[in-house]
Structures are given as structure tokens and as C-alpha cells.
């Protein structure tokens, strides 16, 4: 019921991993409303806090998809943990948009050239934003997507 009311605007979903019980980790998907993250779906596994397998992220997309009202516009905000190509593909198949911060250790291809993101980062000054429209990420060339590289101190 709440999601149906929130879905009149773009639904913003965020991902969070946290300790759950004794020796467990919960990977949670929240819907953001009025600056608060409201739990929507989660999967729990044994282990320590850290990166979860891509299959868990995909399971979370499938759980969330069943709860999202048909026709809702969804944007998922995530970190590098959910940037695997299978995970991105599952969100794309669900019709969701993706905003994901990823590490500079990867590769991208754009306009026929292969780029190491780390090298792009070295070449731009702090405060500069470089846009690569219709880029592809990883060796598998997942895309097209809009790749933004931001120069920062540190």
C-alpha cells in the first residue's frame, strides 16, 4: 500500500549490508522516503560483513520486483558491490535505472577505445567531471551506460 502511494514519483531504492544476528549478514534493499530508508526486502546469510555474492544482489532484485507496483519508475543507488554485470542486467530487466559508484580499478570502453578508469582519474583535476555517454563497463563490455568520472583530492 505504501509503495503504491510512493510510486506516484520515482521510487529511490538503496542497498545496505549489515550484521544480522549471530554470525549472519543481512543484505537489505530500502525505499527512500522523506530522507529515511524504509526496509523493503532483505536476504540473510552466514558470514562476516563485507561484499556479498552477486547472486544475493540478484535475489534481492527479484524480491523487490514482486513488491514494486507495475509501471513504477525505479532508481537504484548503489556502491561498487552491486556493479557486477549479472546484477546490472537483472536490474535492467526489471526496468529499473541504476546509479552506481564503482572502483577505479576497472576498465571501460567508449567510442572504440578501452580505458582504465584509474588512468582517467589520474588525468583529470579535482572538481572536474568527465562524461562518457554510451560507455560499457568491464571486460564483458556491459552497457550502454553513462559513465561519469569525477576528479577528487586524495
Give the predicted meaning of each segment:
Residues 1-3:
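Glycine/alanine-rich phosphate-binding loops at beta-alpha junctions
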Residues 14:
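Aromatic- and Gly/Pro-rich donor/ligand-binding loops
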Residues 29:
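Histidine-anchored nucleotide/phosphate-binding helix
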Residues 6-11, 22-24, 33-154:
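Single, function-defining residue in the core of a domain
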Amino acid at each position: 500500500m505504501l509503495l503504491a502511494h510512493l510510486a506516484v514519483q520515482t521510487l529511490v531504492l538503496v542497498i545496505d549490508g549489515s550484521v544480522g544476528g549471530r554470525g549472519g549478514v543481512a543484505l537489505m534493499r530500502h525505499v527512500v522516503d522523506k530522507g529515511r530508508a524504509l526496509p523493503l526486502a532483505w536476504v540473510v546469510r552466514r558470514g562476516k560483513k563485507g561484499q556479498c555474492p552477486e547472486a544475493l544482489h540478484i535475489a534481492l532484485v527479484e524480491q523487490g520486483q514482486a513488491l514494486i507496483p507495475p509501471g513504477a519508475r525505479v532508481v537504484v543507488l548503489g556502491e561498487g558491490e552491486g556493479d557486477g554485470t549479472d546484477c546490472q542486467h537483472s536490474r535492467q530487466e526489471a526496468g529499473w535505472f541504476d546509479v552506481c559508484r564503482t572502483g577505479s580499478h576497472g576498465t571501460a570502453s567508449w567510442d572504440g577505445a578501452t580505458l582504465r578508469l584509474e588512468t582517467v582519474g589520474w588525468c583529470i583535476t579535482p572538481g572536474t567531471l568527465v562524461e562518457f555517454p554510451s560507455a560499457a563497463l568491464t571486460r564483458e563490455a556491459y552497457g550502454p551506460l553513462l559513465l561519469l568520472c569525477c576528479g577528487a583530492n586524495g
